[in-house]
């Protein structure tokens, strides 16, 4: 019998603990998000530092005795995002919302490589460069299209985005992850669009056309390559 009051007291304590209210999640601050997108697209560089063999290796395409890789245009797009956030703190932690979102899309590498075996200023050099400039146009056009889509994606994301965490740093980091997820999908779509446009340029018909232009330069190039392979 002496144990019953103790058991009752313990039960009462347990019930009291269970009745404590949970820490409420903090209300998120009101914001009117602003999104700014900028582009960095410097003029592509033109290089003749690589020979035909090196361009073959960089292209990743199989070698062929009848097909020579005369040029290669490369481009890499990177993006950076900054968020100015407003935060609210409560017993349940911190809620962060984006007040300003700044995005920058940059063409960090844009390089036209033309085989050094082709003399600068020659008919063949001009034809090959004109072909590569079409690839440059694709890269620049798709970068601008990606910037427009990134603005739309960031605006839609910012309208409802919330980041929560125990600390302000955790809450802002959650916002950054959400922005990265939204923009990476846009950049991925740009890469797919860009690849398709490049394939539309590098057609069999275009390669046949290039093989017939500047006949004197083509003969001189073939003789040069035969002389090199004979050594």
Spans of features found by a protein language model:
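Bacterial N-terminal signal peptides
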Residues: 8-21
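Metalloprotease/metallohydrolase-associated module, dominated by Zn2+-dependent proteases
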Residues: 29, 33-104, 114-115, 157-231
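Short alpha-helix carrying the canonical HExxH Zn2+-binding catalytic motif
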Residues: 121-134
């Amino acid at each position: 019998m002496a144990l019953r009051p103790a058991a009752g007291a313990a039960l009462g304590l347990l019930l009291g603990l269970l009745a404590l209210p949970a820490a409420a999640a903090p209300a998120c601050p009101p914001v009117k998000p602003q999104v700014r997108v900028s582009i960095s697209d410097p003029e592509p560089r033109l290089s003749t530092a690589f020979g035909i063999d090196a361009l073959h290796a960089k292209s990743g395409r199989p070698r062929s005795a009848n097909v020579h890789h005369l040029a290669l245009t490369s481009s890499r797009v990177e993006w950076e995002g900054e968020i100015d956030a407003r935060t609210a703190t409560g017993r349940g932690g911190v809620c962060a919302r984006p007040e300003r979102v700044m995005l920058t899309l940059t063409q960090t590498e844009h390089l036209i490589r033309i085989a050094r075996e082709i003399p600068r200023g020659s008919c063949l050099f001009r034809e090959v460069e004109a072909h590569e400039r079409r690839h440059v146009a694709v890269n620049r056009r798709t970068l601008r299209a990606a910037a427009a889509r990134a603005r739309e994606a960031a605006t839609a994301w910012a309208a409802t985005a919330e980041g929560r965490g125990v600390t302000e740093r955790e809450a802002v980091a959650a916002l950054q992850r959400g922005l990265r997820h939204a923009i990476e999908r846009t950049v991925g779509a740009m890469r797919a669009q860009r690849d398709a446009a490049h394939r539309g340029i590098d057609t069999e018909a275009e390669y046949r056309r290039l093989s017939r232009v500047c006949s004197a330069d083509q003969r001189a190039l073939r003789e040069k390559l035969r002389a090199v392979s004979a050594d």
